[in-house]
Amino acid sequence: MHFSIPETESRSGDSGGSAYVAYNIHVNGVLHCRVRYSQLLGLREQLRKEYGANVLPAFPPKKLFSLTPAEVEQRREQLEKYMQAVRQDPLLGSSETFNSFLRRAQQETQQVPTEEVSLEVLLSNGQKVLVNVLTSDQTEDVLEAVAAKLDLPDDLIGYFSLFLVREKEDGAFSFVRKLQEFELPYVSVTSLRSQEYKIVLRKSYWDSAYDDDVMENRVGLNLLYAQTVSDIERGWILVTKEQHRQLKSLQEKVSKKEFLRLAQTLRHYGYLRFDACVADFPEKDCPVVVSAGNSELSLQLRLPGQQLREGSFRVTRMRCWRVTSSVPLPSGSTSSPGRGRGEVRLELAFEYLMSKDRLQWVTITSPQAIMMSICLQSMVDELMVKKSGGSIRKMLRRRVGGTLRRSDSQQAVKSPPLLESPDATRESMVKLSSKLSAVSLRGIGSPGTDASASDVHGNFAFEGIGDEDL
């Protein structure tokens, strides 16, 4: 996740109190919460007591007198670096102290009282699931509530996640982000104040081998089936006419497992597809459609002759990647804290091993660049878990201080309608992919600047590449 503090505000205290400076914390370019310096100082003290001062990043010191505008800007930059460093630290960033602070701050900023509400969660096929939750319930609480409503077993909950999406006019989903442990889903979706934004349940893993675990259960099987049919209908999974005929026959027979077995062999099965964007590969300002899955990023582009081409970039051949953001200022203006800021431009850049001795940077410019980066990192994490012989099943945190009463009614996952005929142009897809090797890193840049070498962090997945891999 990309944390930033792009702006500050001068606000009046409660009941006419003295004015203070508020720091607006953004996550992936969207306002998450508004906090005072004293609140962040309190968070630092809590982390220091719990983990010790040695592990904490540098924090801007207190000042005896009121800050000048230049000092406010300097403190903003220092606090931004502090929040980014804490979030990227495996220990601090995953701590309940840090995450609960962000949840409380989000709720306070949006002024949402704690109360029981009905929250709508969509399945991949558009089916609605209504769950009773508290406005203060975190992401895992809501995920558990959805699983309970669907009768999905506890040991399969970790195979699914909640995603914030924007529903487009044609009914397709544009992925905004995967909901995280530091946010409150009800507050996150309602604070956007638009009916376009929805919460969707999808599987959270990339390796189709894990499908076997999910398919053992009736509800898990239905969820995978519904997602796969939906992805095929949207053109996210590439299907030839003959494959489409076989799938339709299996669907008519309600042979869900056989349907999924065939779907697993199809190109882009289990991928997330992003909105059309621009890349500098194979040439500058090239319009592409990016998909993530199966340990790779796929870039589809249409050549002048209307033929579709695809370039596949294996995550294990990416030496590093970074996300950078820039905010263009109006022509002739100068930088001023919190003023004159335009729309944020996001870029994902990765250094790719094109051949044994040749590395090349590939840059994708997209509002969804951070989501793409998160997908890359989760694919690396999954590869490392599998390499170490681990499992993606996880122990779920249980509520402290009581449970929220859930409805006992169950909602079956309906079978989707029969598949429509595939687009004939999909058969002209030509794949340009590379063999597997093993390199991966991650990094993220500061707002308004290019990432420097210090922004790129190592990953234990590095194994090198040999002649046989090329």
Swiss-Prot record:
Binding site for a 1,2-diacyl-sn-glycero-3-phospho-(1D-myo-inositol-3-phosphate): R36, S38, K62, R75
Domain PX: 1-109
Keyword Protein transport: yes
Pfam families: PX (PF00787), SNX17-27-31_F1_FERM (PF21273), SNX17-31_F2_FERM (PF21271), SNX17_FERM_C (PF18116)
MF GO annotations: phosphatidylinositol binding
Phosphoserine PTM sites in chain numbering: S336, S407, S409, S415, S421, S437, S440
Span list, region FERM-like: 115-432
InterPro entries hit by this protein: PH-like_dom_sf, PX_dom, PX_dom_sf, RA_dom, SNX17-31_FERM_F1, SNX17-31_FERM_F2, SNX17/31_FERM, SNX17_FERM-like_dom
GO biological process, one term: endocytic recycling
Domain Ras-associating residue range list: 115-206
Annotated region (Disordered), positions in chain: 400-425
Entry's localization field: Cytoplasm; Early endosome; Cytoplasmic vesicle membrane
Membrane topology: Peripheral membrane protein
Major location (coarse): cytoplasm
Protein family (similarity comment): Belongs to the sorting nexin family.
Domain notes: The PX domain mediates specific binding to phosphatidylinositol 3-phosphate (PtdIns(P3)). Required for association with endosomes. The PTB-like F3 module within the FERM-like domain mediates cargo recognition via their NPxY sequences, while the F1 module (Ras-associating) is responsible for interaction with membrane-bound HRAS.
Protein known as: Sorting nexin-17
Organism lineage string: Eukaryota, Metazoa, Chordata, Craniata, Vertebrata
